[in-house]
Amino acid sequence: MPEEKKSTPYEQLRKYKFYAGKQEAKKISASQCGAPLLQLYLSQTCLAVDGPNKFSKATIGSIAHRGMEELIEGEHLEKEIAMERMLSNGWKITGTSDLIDHENKVVIDYKFEMNYAYRMHFKEGPDSPYNMQGACYSWLCHDKDPLGIVTNLDYEFHLMSFITDHSPIKKDHPAEAIQVTQMPIYDNLLFESKMLAKTNELEHAINSKTPPVECDDVWWRSVNGIKVRTRCEYYCKYKDVCPYVTKHSSAKANVASWG
């Protein structure tokens, strides 16, 4: 029999990145805590497919995360710590921190993104996905660790952002391609009250089968003379099932040309 052909590195990555499915009912992850209500509704009611034909930005980020796990070492560091906590209305909030630095009392999350998304996220205010993700980790750490031991950790939350299209000669780019940002942390009771209100509203929408209103900020941008919902077209995996976005709503832009 002929020797079986070994898969190429690219083929292995294609297998690693495939995802298709619907999120577990009544569960929200830390990275979703600041997401628009419509996006959460679609995640609970529709299938999201990261299909076999192309790599998504999330795929590249996942692969890079695996590399960071192997690169950073230290006895005072914990990697990929999964936590979860229940709200009083039965919704589960989960979070997996990329890195916890016990020596410096910091929870670190890696972000791999283009400069445009990096800048836009920091313009979104106190309820931005990044701020709410940090608030979620703080809230989770104040409950229990993975072994069930109450910790009440008062740790800072830092974002380590890797600007994938960084250019030192462009004025709107940061000085370096890797940026570490200390994020403000919500009061834990305030975070919990916000998430209770959000999940109650979400559950009502699900039960009534009524999609929430369109997302407030879809990052409108004119690209090659065409007005594009940037956030929908390039950063939302539910765009093909969103009632406010059609597959032909805007032409695809040449992302490589963006600054």
Sequence positions of predicted segments:
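Metal-dependent nuclease catalytic cores that hydrolyze phosphodiester bonds in DNA/RNA
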Residues: 1-107, 114-122, 128, 142, ...
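Metal-dependent nuclease catalytic regions and adjoining charged, substrate-binding loops involved
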Residues: 4-5, 143-259
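Generic detection of long, well-ordered alpha-helical segments
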Residues: 54-62, 127, 131, 185-196
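Long, highly charged amphipathic alpha-helices
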Residues: 63-70, 136, 193-197, 201
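Metal-dependent nuclease catalytic cores in nucleic-acid-processing enzymes
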Residues: 66-73, 123-161
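Residue-level recognition of conserved beta-strand positions in structured domain cores
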Residues: 109-112, 157
